A protein has these predicted regions:
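Charge-rich amphipathic alpha-helical interaction elements
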Residues: 1-204
Length: 204
């Protein structure tokens, strides 16, 4: 801790700093709470996303029994090709994060007379699963970025609560004591000088 100047100017500076810290701390604490809430929201979204994937897998399993041979899964895979993953950006509690918009698939034609009628349903189910997984990756990235900001904000809250504010209050206390002692000493010296002067005048 830097050595404190024991002056009235330093006292004013420390008081001003304390006011600033105490004014800024609630904003940091609120941001910390918002970030914690958003992280919980991300976890809820991931849980819901995983439940949707499981439901889609169950729907796909219904078509698996219709696959007439070992080539059917490959025929489904051949009908699926990702063209683009659409994302944007969003601001969550002051954090810039990616936002999932969807997955675009290439339109791969097939011979409707050669393929079984259930193939389109199986393709749609697999596409849905892929889209759900891509969305989950984006949510996980949101969680990671929000977590980084939460760690930084928590460090700043701790710095204010445990270091800056207590340190500034202690500086104010030390300066006030020093100024009080100096004022007391000045009064004592003044009285001594006055008595000495009165004694000299009496002797004359």
């Amino acid at each position: 801790m830097a050595k404190v100047k024991l002056t009235k100017t330093a006292l004013k500076q420390e008081r001003d700093a304390l006011k600033q810290f105490e004014r800024f701390l609630p904003t940091l604490q609120l941001k910390k709470q918002q970030l914690q809430m958003e992280m919980r929201h991300c976890l809820d979204q991931i849980e819901q996303n995983e439940a949707r994937e499981e439901a889609s897998k169950n729907a796909l399993r219904a078509w698996v029994s219709l696959f007439g041979d070992d080539t059917a899964p490959q025929r489904v895979a051949d009908r699926i090709r990702v063209k683009a993953i659409r994302t944007g950006s969003a601001n969550i509690a002051g954090v810039a994060v990616p936002k999932f918009h969807g997955v675009d698939f290439e339109d791969i034609p097939c011979d409707l007379f050669l393929e079984e009628p259930w193939l389109d349903d199986a393709v749609d189910a697999v596409k849905q699963i892929l889209e759900i997984r891509e969305e989950r990756e984006i949510i996980r990235e949101q969680y990671r970025l929000i977590g980084q900001e939460l760690r930084t904000t928590t460090q700043r809250v701790n710095l204010f609560e445990k270091v800056k504010i207590p340190e500034t209050k202690e500086n104010i206390r030390i300066i006030q004591i020093a100024i009080g002692d100096a004022q007391t000493s000045a009064v004592v010296r003044s009285k001594i000088a006055k008595k000495k002067l009165q004694g000299e005048e009496g002797a004359a």
